[in-house]
A protein has these predicted regions:
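Non-catalytic, mostly N-terminal accessory regions of nucleic-acid modification and defense proteins
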Residues: 1-203
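Conserved S-adenosyl-L-methionine
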Residues: 182-257
Length: 257
């Protein structure tokens, strides 16, 4: 499912005047994917909070949530049996969609960096990512097609996330094999695994990659530590918030990682 969707999105972006290379395809697909993934993550957290009788406050304000601007759904019984389908009457498209993304959405997301209480928060990371990005999809109609394709995807199970990560890895590797500079973000996974095993990091260490690229080393280190022992609640919090750091000078790597 993911592979065919990526191919369809590449075909859409190929005809857009703002996207001239495979690097552009990856970057522009990635920021839309990130916002869809963030929306799914917030839904999971809200559900978990509800099951424990707790309240959950969304990171993203309602106006800027995926289900509001990107993929509003028909929820009324008057929808003629189409509940859950895209509401074409309220979904932005064309110039309206482009203007919303460029004038409202991106500036809103960039502000998260300045407003965050620390660099360890997800708010800071959102702001950091969108401070380095620009929407290059010039046609709002093409952007609408991309959004519709991505909205069909689900990455809420381990298997779905695993498939997505492997497809991304192959895409980055292929850019390198084709002689494009996207290959600088790719190190073969077996080599990364070997290096991490030799270094043998421990929970409590600070792990920093000064040329983080697509974060392959950090992801592999996380996976290694996650399976190194039975984790306590404190260990999990340490891994999620106080262990991994990276720096990259090029904007593409932020969103790929």
């Amino acid at each position: 499912m993911f592979e065919q969707t990526f191919k369809n999105i590449d075909d859409i972006l190929h005809k857009d005047a703002g996207c001239g290379s495979e690097l552009d395809y990856v970057e522009q697909t990635s920021w839309v994917l990130f916002l869809k993934y963030l929306d799914d993550l917030e839904k999971d957290k809200a559900t978990a909070a509800e099951l424990t009788g707790k309240a959950y406050t969304n990171i993203i304000d309602k106006e800027y949530q995926w289900s509001k601007w990107a993929a509003p759904k028909i929820s009324s019984p008057l929808g003629g049996g189409r509940e859950g389908a895209l509401d074409h009457h309220t979904a932005l498209t064309g110039d309206d969609l482009s203007d919303f993304v460029n004038i409202k959405l991106f500036p809103y997301l960039k502000k998260f960096k300045a407003d965050a209480v620390s660099a360890d928060t997800i708010e800071y990371k959102i702001g950091e990512i969108f401070s380095e990005l620009k929407n290059r999809i010039q046609s709002g109609y093409n952007l609408r097609e991309v959004i519709n394709r991505i909205d069909e995807l689900r990455f809420r199970t381990h298997a779905e996330k695993h498939e997505m990560s492997h497809l991304y890895e192959d895409k980055i590797k292929n850019m390198g094999n084709a002689g494009r500079n996207g290959g600088e973000y790719y190190t073969p996974r077996p080599l990364i695994k070997t290096i991490v095993k030799v270094v043998a990091p421990e929970i409590g260490n600070k792990i920093y990659d000064g040329a983080v690229g697509s974060a392959g080393f950090l992801c592999e280190a996380f996976d290694y530590l996650q399976h190194s022992k039975k984790l306590t609640t404190t260990d999990v919090a340490t891994l999620q918030k106080k262990t991994f750091y990276g720096k990259e000078k090029k904007s593409l790597a932020y969103i790929i990682g």
